[in-house]
Amino acid sequence: MNKTAAEAIALANEVAQLVKAEVSADVQVIMAPPSLFIYEVNKAVSGISNLAVSAQNCHEKSSGAYTGEISANMLASSGISYVILGHSERRQYFAESNTQLAAKVDAALAAGLTPIFCCGESLDLREGGEFLAYVAQQLTESLFHLSAEDFAKVVIAYEPIWAIGTGLTASSDQAQEMHAYLRGHLATKYGQNAADNCSILYGGSCNAKNAQELFACADVDGGLIGGASLVAADFITIATSF
């Protein structure tokens, strides 16, 4: 939860100008404001082919008596293209399960949105040597019911929870190891070609200082940016790090 309405629109306008001036046309930039500001932010960035807007979450039902919730259909009707699902904070604070996230993925796809599906492990799981199986299970239980056609519409974001706000940092070697493993696991279900074509983003405290090294990894296709996205100049530095 960051930015007031005025601050969010100002940030969107600044990012839009910087994307037009500095970011290569083949680099896709996505902003994910709070749902309250999506419509205005989307208007602010409209007309820029490589700048899009995402929601941070959606409900798994298309409509109904779920006070305070927002459906994928409602998000799509606002003109956006993406929705983040399964973010580590949603899993931690709202107890979102793999089963629930499978339903959210289905809802997003049915509404024509591209899901950015997040997965990742805690420090305990990493230190216990259970992290590979844990993250594989997240993918299997939330995505492997999809047809090959629908899977091709999904973006994956790996979040090493142990490297977010802990003072610890994942090395580029650790990031590459996990991304290669995730791609290999996806290939067991959908084949190597489909896995190779899947965008896998890195979301563990990626910032202006480490983005270039991380993005140089063979299996890191981009970043899911947190705090660094709140400052336009830092965000654009990351976007120009490819």
Q: What do these predicted ranges mean?
A:
Residues M1-A157, I161-F242:
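Active-site loop-to-helix "anion-binding N-cap" substructures in soluble metabolic enzymes
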